[in-house]
């Protein structure tokens, strides 16, 4: 069993068709967990893990509909940070707002991935402004509003940063499990590992 300092539990928040499964697919391929010649069953990414530089990163899918509010909240209580994936043309949509609001209320840090920057109608600067406005509207604290941004084309496995930088962001932004109490909880030992 790994010590908790070597584990990060990360949730991916995205609206339908913004590239969540594709992003995870390429993360798995690039870390050697998943080979390019394998096929991935649709929605198989509910929970996956990659290991990078000795740190196990558990990737958790989040349902995006308000009907699953309880499930979203339970899932987010297990993670140490979130990847917010937003389409470079469509921007943040209602499904994104709902889940991100839950994550911010729990005090979770975020890494923002603006995906599909290769679309002809992509408008990454405007979308990033909309993301900042969304964070402010949802009451993000000063640490949450200082999120790192990655511009990506997930289906091509490309990002504006080197892969090693991309993999370091979730590890660097999220604290180890149990290192930060959730609002209303007292500090103490609390480790959760998703296997």
What are these regions (language model features)?
Residues 1-16, 88-195:
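P-loop NTPase catalytic nucleotide-binding module
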Residues 1-86, 99-100, 126, 130:
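P-loop NTPase switch module centered on the Walker A-proximal segment
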């Amino acid at each position: 069993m790994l010590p908790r300092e070597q584990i990060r539990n990360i949730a991916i928040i995205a609206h339908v068709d913004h590239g969540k499964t594709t992003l995870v697919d390429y993360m798995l391929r690039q870390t050697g967990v998943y080979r390019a010649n394998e096929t991935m069953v649709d929605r198989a990414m509910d929970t996956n893990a990659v290991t990078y530089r000795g740190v196990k990163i558990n990737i958790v899918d989040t349902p995006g509909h308000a009907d699953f509010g309880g499930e979203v909240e339970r899932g987010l209580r297990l993670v140490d940070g979130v990847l917010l994936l937003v389409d470079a043309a469509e921007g943040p949509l209602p499904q994104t707002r709902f889940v991100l609001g839950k994550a911010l209320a729990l005090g979770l840090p975020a890494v923002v991935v603006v995906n599909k920057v290769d679309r002809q109608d992509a408008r990454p600067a405007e979308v990033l402004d909309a993301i900042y406005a969304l964070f402010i509207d949802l009451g993000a604290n000063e640490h949450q509003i200082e999120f790192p941004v990655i511009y990506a084309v997930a289906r091509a496995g490309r990002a504006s940063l080197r892969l090693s930088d991309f993999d370091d962001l979730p590890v660097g932004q999220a604290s180890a499990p149990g290192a930060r109490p959730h609002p209303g909880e007292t500090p103490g030992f609390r480790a959760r590992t998703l296997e």
